[in-house]
Amino acid sequence: MASVVVKTIWQSKEIHEAGDPPAGVESRAQLVPEAPGGVTSPAKGITKKKKAVSFHGVEPRMSHEPMHWCLNLKRSSACTNVSLLNLAAVEPDSSGTDSTTEDSGPLALPGPPASPTTPWAPEDPDITELLSGVNSGLVRAKDSITSLKEKTTRVNQHVQTLQSECSVLSENLERRRQEAEELEGYCSQLKGPRPDVLTQENCRKVTRSVEDAEIKTNVLKQNSALLEEKLRYLQQQLQDETPRRQEAELQELEQKLEAGLSRHGLSPATPIQGCSGPPGSPEEPPRQRGLSSSGWGMAVRTGEGPSLSEQELQKVSTGLEELRREVSSLAARWHQEEGAVQEALRLLGGLGGRLDGFLGQWERAQREQAQSARGLQELRGRADELCTMVERSAVSVASLRSELEALGPVKPILEELGRQLQNSRRGADHVLNLDRSAQGPCARCASQGQQLSTESLQQLLERALTPLVDEVKQKGLAPACPSCQRLHKKILELERQALAKHVRAEALSSTLRLAQDEAVRAKNLLLTDKMKPEEKVATLDYMHLKMCSLHDQLSHLPLEGSTGAMGGGSNGGAPPKRGSPGSEQ
């Protein structure tokens, strides 16, 4: 009978995990002899007794299919408690685990190669470590993708807020433009040739629009400053967090994975290359083949590990492909959002340019308003001066009118005064002649005599004035002598002159009333601030010329009246020269 090798495989879940050794336990194990009495010695950290079952009759497949063996296991009747055996041992020990039986038939179980090798060398890192690194890289990549998605959503929200703010700013600018056009219309209306059309409502509208424009300009400045700060923050954030960094990390992870796979040669044909030949090669002794047959079965069990790792690698590759697709889609979305941000920046640049233009126009309007305010102040000052001049002229005209009215009852007094002056002159001349003949020619005495004569003349005038006036009023007789006729003519001329002066005074009073009305109207216009500087200057020039003409008339009128009155009185009251017809009469 031929000797048959019997191996013990655990009847537990380790029978399915025999080909998957735990991570870090990748070394060549030794066979442990079976203790007598079925008590197993501790090996590989396992101390519990387990029930085992024996199998025999392992049949290999053809030699050209070394990795896809089908196990044809038959359960034996022997059931014992044995220790855990390393089924992948290279140098087996037949003292504790092998049992031989005699059989008349040929050898039923040919052995695999003498030295089956594991797919990983002892000094190489474990596939689990590489897969854990790949999984951690994938987790980090997914986390970075989620963070990038969150950041892109935040960027989209910022872009939407910026677009809404830009739309609001454009609406505000459109409104400002309309208000600026209205303001220009008001300014053109203010500069128009019809100042009487301007009312107080227009000025109030202009002031309200100017104040609203100031407030809205300040709001626009604040909004533009906030937008600039937000854009700077977004640019810094986008510069700090870009998808290129994520792509670089993914490429580095792929390079590491490919380098690890290429270095360890993970492929379906790798375990085959590690074998020296198919099972049943005639170069090996029968004992060796018999012992290594069960070891080849263990190699088949351990061959399930690379298949599982291949599935994990396929999962990793599919995950990497999905990650690449997501990164490419994110990059495309990022480029679209970057274009939207560039468009928003361009719109903001145009908005800033339009805002600068509007601010320039606003500054020019402010300067023009300041100039108009200064012109209004000057116009108010000149109007106040004009009002004072008009008031003074009104006072002078009133005094002139009172004086002219007082000239009416003076006519008979002047007539009687002329007569009395003639009589007094005659008497004074006679007295002076007598004094000169008596005293002789002395200048001092002559001057004293003149003083005495003037004093006496005043006294005589005061004494004789009232009875003469009464007599003239009572009699009213026409003069008969030529001197009286001349005096009467002069008195009539004086009456005509007084009447003409009265008419002129009435005309002057009417013109003064008109000037007062115009001054009041100009003052009201100045108070309402509706006139342009050119109109104010023209009005002031016109009023100044008018006031100058009025002053000239007023200055000439009292002088003419006084000189006329005095001239008439002197001419009418002067005594005729000696030798004249009046003196002879």
UniProtKB/Swiss-Prot annotation:
Biased amino acid composition, Low complexity: 91-108
Subcellular location: Cytoplasm, Cytoskeleton, Microtubule organizing center, Centrosome, Centriole; Cytoplasmic vesicle, Secretory vesicle, Acrosome
PTM note: Phosphorylated on serine residue(s) by STK22A/TSSK1 and STK22B/TSSK2.
A GO cellular component entry from the record: acrosomal vesicle
Tissue-specific expression: Testis specific.
Disordered, as annotated region: 91-125, 264-312, 559-585
PTM annotation (Phosphoserine): residues: 224, 281, 309
Recorded GO MF terms: protein kinase binding
Main location: cytoplasm
Keyword Phosphoprotein (UniProt): yes
Alphabetically ordered keywords of this record: Cytoplasm, Cytoplasmic vesicle, Cytoskeleton, Phosphoprotein
Coiled coil regions, renumbered to chain: none
Job description of the protein: May play a role in testicular physiology, most probably in the process of spermatogenesis or spermatid development.
Protein name: Testis-specific serine kinase substrate
Gene: Tsks
